Amino acid sequence: MVKIDKILLSIFQRTFKSITDEMSISLTKTTRSPILCEAKDFVTGLYDAKGNMLEQTENLPILSFSLGPVCRVILDQYGDDISPGDVIIHNDVFSMGNQNNDVAIFKPIFHEDTLIGWAAAKGHQADIGGAVQGGYNPNATEVWQEAIRIPAVKLYEE
């Protein structure tokens, strides 16, 4: 059986919590969207190299646990083609996204040449295209009529 150092575990947990809180504060202070800065319809988090959640803010509980599975989609899609400078965008409901208006950004974290984790943020966007304003279209017959679908795509590649 592995012995867990409770003090070290607590230090890491509080450090990760502090980081995700700072991510949340930065997003709130820099966004121009009232959906994000006033309604707090977003989440920030840290994940290990396999996409398992280490820490995540509690801004909107329905978004909890929504980013880890997308990390695994990114790993399946890109494999070893992930570099320290990459930035990946995603909102696709057919690859673990929860709705097209919730757009996520992922940044891999490396130590030397080894992927050790992910920093990610997901937030609700008022309108990202579609047949009607706001993305809610009760007459839609396909997802493309609601909003643009963005599978895991490198927004920036090192």
Model-derived features: where do they sit?
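Conserved mixed alpha/beta core segments that line enzyme active sites in large multi-domain catalysts
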Residues: 25-33, 52-54, 68-108
